[in-house]
C-alpha cells in the first residue's frame, strides 16, 4: 500500500538514495537538489511539502509540492502583458514541484497511486485556498504526460503559443 510521509531524520537518507533510469535523468532534478530548493524556499517563508513515497515500509519515491498565492507568469517572460497573463494573474494554486519513483520500483502503479495521495493532500488546502494544482514536465516525457492526463491534468490551450522550444510544458488540474 502506497502512503506519503514527510521527509524527516528517519527517511531522508533513503530519499537521497533514490535514482531514476539514465534516460530519465534529464526529466527530474536529483533529490539532494530538490531538498536544497525546499530548504531555500522554506527559508524565504514559502510553503513546501516534501514527502517520501512508501510502499508499505520501503521508500520507493519522492514528491515535493508547494503553494503560490499570486501567479505572476514570471517564469515565462513572453507571457507578460499577454492574454494568458491577464487571465491567470493573481490566481492561487498548488504545484507539484518534483516527483520521481526509483528505477527499481517503476511500472508497478506506484507513481499513479502516489500522485492520487498527493492530490488528496493538496485538496485539503494546507496553505490556503486555491483553484488549481499545476505541474510541468519535459515535452519529450510522454510517460509523464500520459500519467498526468489520466489524473485530470490538461495543458491549457492558451499557453501553447508562448512556449519556447526548450520550455517544460505546464499542465493544470482544477480542484
Language-model segments: residues:
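Residues forming the Rossmann-fold NAD(P)(H) cofactor-binding site
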Residues: 112
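Acetyl-CoA-dependent GNAT
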Residues: 2-104, 115-117, 121-127, 161
Amino acid at each position: 500500500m502506497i502512503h506519503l510521509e514527510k521527509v524527516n531524520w528517519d527517511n531522508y537518507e533513503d530519499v537521497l538514495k533514490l535514482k531514476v533510469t539514465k534516460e530519465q535523468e534529464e526529466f527530474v532534478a536529483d533529490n539532494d537538489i530538490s531538498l536544497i530548493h525546499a530548504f531555500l524556499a522554506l527559508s524565504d517563508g514559502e510553503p513546501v511539502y516534501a514527502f517520501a513515497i512508501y510502499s508499505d515500509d520501503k521508500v520507493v519515491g519522492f514528491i515535493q509540492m508547494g503553494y503560490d498565492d499570486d501567479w505572476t507568469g514570471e517564469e515565462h517572460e513572453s507571457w507578460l502583458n499577454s492574454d494568458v497573463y491577464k487571465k491567470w494573474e493573481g490566481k492561487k494554486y498548488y504545484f507539484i514541484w518534483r516527483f520521481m519513483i526509483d528505477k527499481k520500483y517503476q511500472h508497478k502503479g506506484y507513481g499513479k497511486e502516489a500522485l492520487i495521495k498527493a492530490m488528496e493532500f493538496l485538496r485539503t488546502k494546507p496553505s490556503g485556498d486555491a483553484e488549481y494544482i499545476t505541474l510541468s514536465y519535459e515535452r519529450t516525457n510522454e510517460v509523464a504526460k500520459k500519467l498526468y492526463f489520466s489524473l485530470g491534468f490538461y495543458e491549457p490551450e492558451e499557453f501553447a503559443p508562448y512556449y519556447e522550444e526548450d520550455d517544460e510544458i505546464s499542465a493544470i488540474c482544477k480542484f
